[in-house]
């Protein structure tokens, strides 16, 4: 919600799905004057202890990459079993191109494997 991080600037010209200006405007409207550091507005500032296993995927070319890595580190520090699955060269929402990109199909397969592993009775 604070719309900050290295990837906001570094990937602004690469991420074709997310517009930093529009996202900042949307965050401001959503927050309606509330501090963006409020845990209910952003999990980056929440107490993550006790969360179930967490799977985070991000593309290295998306503007939300910094948020994704920060969330993964915070979750890890809180004792959460977290998997950060980074995809080189991908922008936000590359999964939508499942019929075009082998990376999208592979990413979705990683999601399936994570869910299957964590929902199987015997591990």
Residue ranges and their predicted role:
Residues 1-123:
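Alpha/beta-hydrolase superfamily serine-hydrolase fold, recognizing
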């Amino acid at each position: 919600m604070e719309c900050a991080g290295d990837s906001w600037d570094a990937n602004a010209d690469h991420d074709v799905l997310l517009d930093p200006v529009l996202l900042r405007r949307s965050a401001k409207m959503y927050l309606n004057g509330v501090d963006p550091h409020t845990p209910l507005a952003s999990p980056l500032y929440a107490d993550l202890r006790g969360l179930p296993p967490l799977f985070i995927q991000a593309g290295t070319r998306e503007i939300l990459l910094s948020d994704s890595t920060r969330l993964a580190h915070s979750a890890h520090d809180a004792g959460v079993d977290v998997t950060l699955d980074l995809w080189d060269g991908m922008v936000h929402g590359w999964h939508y191109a499942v019929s075009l990109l082998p990376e999208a199909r592979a990413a979705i397969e990683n999601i399936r494997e994570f869910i299957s592993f964590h929902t199987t009775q015997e591990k």
